[in-house]
Structure formats: C-alpha cells, structure tokens
C-alpha cells in the first residue's frame, strides 16, 4: 500500500516543480470553472484530508510561496483532537487543527471544506446516517468560520 504521507521537503519540491512547469495550484472552489469547461489553463487541484496540524505547519507557507491555493477537508467534531479513526490500525495519534488554526489556514489563502462530523466510512454507512454526517459538518464549519 502506498503511503498517504508526503514529507515536507518532498511536498515543497512537488509544488516548485508544478510552478516551474507553469501549473497553478488551486483550491476546489477555484478549480470548478476549469472542471466545468468555463476556463482553460494549466491547473491542478490541491487537497488535504482530515485537517492535520502538520498541514498548517508544513504546507501553508509553501503554498503561499508559489501563490497556490488548496482545500483542506476537516472532520468538524474532531477539531483540536487527534485521528481517532486510525488508532485501531496502530497508527500513532496526530493532532488535528482547531478552529483558531483553521482561521490561520484561511488567512494564508487556503480553503476549508467539510469532510464529515466524525470521519465515518461513508461507503459503509447508509444514506440515513451519512446525510447528517455531511450536512451537520458543513453547517458547523460555516457557523464557526464565517
């Protein structure tokens, strides 16, 4: 299985390479006109999953350096906590951003998106349970961040 982890130096090199090749890194909101065919250009969508503190610590400055934007999909009910969904897999706890850190993320030119409330596996969750996970996460984030 491939790792989902990219070292800070590898990430910086990836962003530098994209920039040198003429690509513009975009958040999902900024990418949508390209996906709909309303705009053309050399673009790439940049996303982060779960809202780890290390995204803020390691990626925000690099993205800003290259004038790239990104979207970080966060787990609304676990902000300021850890990746509890990984504990059963033997993966070490890692801190997740809190609301203050998310505000810094946004202030650095990045975007926040809704993952779910509790990081449930939506492929194993019925529609009746998955809809509130998604909707309530979005509502909570909108109220806290706007």
PLM features per residue range, with description:
Residues 36, 55-57:
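Short N-terminal helix/helix-N-cap motif within the alpha/beta-hydrolase-1
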């Amino acid at each position: 299985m491939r790792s989902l982890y990219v070292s800070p130096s590898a990430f910086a090199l990836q962003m530098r390479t994209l920039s040198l090749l003429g690509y513009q890194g975009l958040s999902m909101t900024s990418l949508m006109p390209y996906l709909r065919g309303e705009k053309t250009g050399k673009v790439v969508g940049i996303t982060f999953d779960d809202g780890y503190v290390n995204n803020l610590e390691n990626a925000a400055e690099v993205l800003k350096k290259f004038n790239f934007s990104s979207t970080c999909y966060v787990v609304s009910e676990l902000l300021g906590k850890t990746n509890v969904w990984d504990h059963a897999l033997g993966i070490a706890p890692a801190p997740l951003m809190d609301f203050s850190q998310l505000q810094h993320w946004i202030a650095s030119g990045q975007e926040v998106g809704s993952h779910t409330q509790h990081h449930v596996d939506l492929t194993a969750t019925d529609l009746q349970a998955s809809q509130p996970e998604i909707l309530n996460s979005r509502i909570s984030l909108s109220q806290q961040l706007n």
